[in-house]
Design a protein with these regions (language model features):
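Cleavable N-terminal signal peptides of Sec/SRP-targeted secreted and luminal proteins
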Residues: 3-17
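Loop/turn elements at helix/coil->beta-strand transitions in domains of secreted/extracellular proteins
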Residues: 17-21, 51-56, 109-114, 163-170, ...
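Active-site-proximal cap/lid insertion segments
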Residues: 27-40, 121, 125, 159-340, ...
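Short, structured active-site-proximal loop/turn typified by the sulfatase FGly-forming signature C/S-X-P-X-R
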Residues: 33-69, 75-80, 110-114, 274, ...
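Secretory-pathway/luminal and periplasmic proteins that interact with or process carbohydrate-rich
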Residues: 55-56, 79-82, 177-183, 275-278, ...
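Acidic/polar loop patches that form or flank catalytic/metal-binding clefts of enzymes
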Residues: 55-57, 303-309, 327-347, 356-364, ...
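Catalytic-site neighborhoods of secreted/periplasmic enzymes
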Residues: 71-170, 175-176, 180-183
Length: 511
C-alpha cells in the first residue's frame, strides 16, 4: 500500500497541469503586423504570434456573431446546433437544448470554466460557465471593451484558479472592433473608438489604454474596399479601436503570466468573422470567411514564431480543447441522429509532419445574421478552390444594420445613385444578386470575381467539391440540404417541389 501511494505521488509530480485560454475578437480581421499589415501598430498581437504557430489559412465556420460563437463553444455547425442567427433581443435565435457544449463537457470532467466579455449565445442551460462576467449581467462596453475592467475580472478568475486544483478553460470575448451603436454619429465614434480614450469629453477614461490615432492617409485599404476618403476615414477609426484590442491582448497575456499559468496553458487566438465592411462580415467570400488564427502551446515551443499552410477553422476549437484535456466527445443523439464532431484537433498541426486530408479543406454554413437576413450559404474551401452554394439566390443578398449604416457603404451607395465612379472592384448589382453556385479558382482569381461554376473546364472540379460538400451536409444533418429545388421530408428523403412530381407523391401517399 505504501509503495502504491509513493508511486501515485511520484507520477502525479510528473503530470503537467493543462489549461486553455481562448482569445476571441469581435469582427477582427487581418489588421496586424503579424499578418502583413505594415501600417498598423500591433505589438502585443505580434508578440503573441512570436510564441505561437500562425495559421495562414484560418477561417470562420460562419460569418456572423452569435452563430460563430455557438460553433466555437459547441463544435457543431449552425445548421446542426440550432443557432441560425443572432441571439440577442427580438432575434431570439438559440441552440437546441440537447447540444453538449464545451463548458458543459468540461464541467463533467472536473475542469473549471470561465468567460469574461461578450457571450451572445443561448440558452444558458447549454452555454453555462462556472464563472461568468458577460453582457447578460453587466454593460457590454464595460466588460467587453474596457480593458482595465476586463483585466480585473480576469485576474479574479486566475487568482481563484491558483487556489483550485482543477485545470481551467478561460474564454475571453473581446467586443472590439465591432462597430458602435448608433452606427453613425454617436458620441462614442463609429467603432467606439472614442470610448474611454481620455480625449473626448463625456466618453470616460480607460486607464490601461494608450490610444493610437491614425490619419486617413496612414491606413492600408484592402482590395475589397474602394479607396475613397470615406473609406479611409472609416478605416482610421477602426485602426484606433484595434489599438485598444491589441493592448487588451497584452494585458490579458500578462495576467496569465503573473498568475503563473503561462507555462501550462494552451492559447487559441482568433475572431468570430471578418471586419464589418462590404464583402467581408456576413459574407463567405475570403474577407468574411478568413480569420486570424494562432495557437500557442507551451509544450510545442519549436513551433513558436512559425507559420503553417494547414487549414484551420473555428469548428476545430472544440476538438482541439478536448484533445488537449484528453477528453472524448460524448455519444448522444439529436433529432434521432447520432451527433459527432466534423472538425479536427489542430494540435496535430503542431507536430513535425502535418497529416494530409483534414488540413486541406474547411466548411462553412450560414443561415441568418439578423432575422430579416435570410440568405443561407454552404461552402467548401480548399487551398486553391472555393465552392459556394447560395440557397436563396433568387432573393437579393440582405445587409446587416451595421453594414449599410456606415460611411463606407453609404459612400458606395451615393456614388452609384449619382453615377460617380465608386472605385469599388465590384458593383452593387453583383453584390446583391448572386448565382446559385459560385466556384472560384483562388490561385488565378484570389479576389473571387470570376464564377467558374458553369465552365466545362471546371466540370469535374465542381462535381468533386459538390459531392464532398453534400456529404458533409448529410453527416451534420443539415435540414436545408435539399434546397432550393427539393424539400426534406421526415424520412430524410429529398422530394422535388415541382407540381407534377408533388402530385404524384400525393397520389402515392393516398394509396
Amino acid at each position: 500500500m505504501m509503495i502504491k501511494t509513493w508511486l501515485m505521488l511520484c507520477f502525479a509530480g510528473l503530470i503537467q497541469a493543462k489549461n486553455v485560454l481562448i482569445l476571441l475578437g469581435d469582427d477582427v480581421g487581418f489588421q496586424f503586423g503579424a499578418y502583413g499589415n505594415t501600417k498598423i501598430k500591433s505589438p502585443n498581437v505580434d508578440a503573441l504570434a512570436k510564441r505561437s504557430l500562425l495559421f495562414k489559412n484560418g477561417f470562420t465556420s460562419v460569418s456572423s456573431c452569435s452563430p460563430s460563437r455557438s460553433v466555437v463553444m459547441s463544435g457543431l455547425p449552425v445548421h446542426q446546433n440550432g443557432m441560425y442567427g443572432l441571439h440577442g433581443g427580438f432575434m431570439h435565435f438559440q441552440s437546441f437544448n440537447g447540444v453538449r457544449s464545451l463548458p458543459m463537457i468540461l464541467n463533467q470532467h472536473n475542469i473549471r470554466t470561465g468567460i469574461v466579455g461578450k457571450k451572445h449565445v443561448g440558452p444558458d442551460t447549454v452555454y453555462k460557465f462556472d464563472y461568468e462576467v458577460t453582457e447578460e449581467h453587466y454593460n457590454l462596453n464595460q466588460v467587453g471593451r474596457n480593458i482595465t475592467c476586463m483585466k480585473e475580472y480576469i485576474r479574479k478568475f486566475l487568482q481563484d484558479s491558483k487556489n483550485d486544483s482543477r485545470p481551467f478553460l478561460l474564454y475571453i470575448g473581446i467586443h472590439d472592433i465591432h462597430r458602435c451603436y448608433p452606427y453613425i454619429g454617436g458620441k462614442l465614434g463609429n467603432f467606439c473608438d472614442k470610448f474611454g480614450d481620455g480625449m473626448t469629453p463625456g466618453t470616460g477614461y480607460i486607464k490601461d489604454w494608450k490610444p493610437i490615432v491614425y490619419k486617413p492617409e496612414d491606413v492600408e485599404v484592402p482590395y475589397f474596399l474602394p479607396d475613397t476618403p470615406a473609406t479611409r476615414e472609416d478605416l482610421a477609426a477602426m485602426y484606433k479601436t484595434y489599438s485598444r484590442f491589441d493592448q487588451g491582448v497584452g494585458l490579458f497575456m500578462k495576467e496569465l503570466e503573473d498568475a503563473g499559468f503561462a507555462d501550462d496553458t494552451l492559447v487559441i487566438f482568433t475572431s468570430d468573422n471578418g471586419i464589418p465592411f462590404p464583402f467581408a462580415k456576413t459574407n463567405l467570400y475570403d474577407p468574411g470567411q478568413g480569420e486570424p488564427f494562432m495557437v500557442s502551446s507551451p509544450y510545442h515551443k519549436e513551433t513558436w514564431g512559425k507559420k503553417t499552410d494547414a487549414m484551420a477553422s473555428t469548428m476545430d476549437i472544440v476538438p482541439t480543447v478536448l484533445d488537449w484535456f484528453d477528453i472524448k466527445y460524448p455519444k448522444y443523439k439529436m433529432n434521432s441522429k447520432q451527433v459527432s464532431l466534423t472538425g479536427k484537433s489542430v494540435l496535430n498541426a503542431l507536430k513535425p509532419h502535418v497529416p494530409p486530408g483534414p488540413f486541406d479543406r474547411v466548411f462553412s454554413s450560414h443561415v441568418f445574421h439578423e432575422i430579416t437576413m435570410y440568405y443561407p450559404m454552404r461552402v467548401i474551401r480548399t487551398k486553391d478552390t472555393k465552392l459556394i452554394h447560395n440557397l436563396n439566390f433568387r432573393a437579393p443578398y440582405g445587409l446587416a444594420t451595421d453594414l449599410y449604416q456606415n460611411p463606407t457603404f453609404l459612400d458606395i451607395l451615393n456614388r452609384t445613385e449619382s453615377g460617380q465612379p465608386t472605385k469599388w472592384f465590384t458593383t452593387l448589382q453583383k453584390y446583391y444578386y448572386r448565382d446559385e453556385w459560385q466556384l472560384f479558382n483562388l490561385t488565378s482569381d484570389p479576389h473571387e470575381q470570376k464564377n467558374l461554376a458553369g465552365s466545362a473546364e471546371y466540370k469535374n472540379v465542381f462535381k468533386s467539391l459538390k459531392k464532398t460538400l453534400n456529404q458533409w451536409l448529410l453527416d451534420t444533418n443539415d435540414p436545408w440540404r435539399c434546397l432550393p429545388d427539393e424539400e426534406l421530408e421526415e424520412n430524410g428523403v429529398c422530394y422535388p417541389m415541382d407540381n407534377r412530381k408533388f402530385s404524384d407523391m400525393q397520389v402515392n401517399v393516398l394509396r
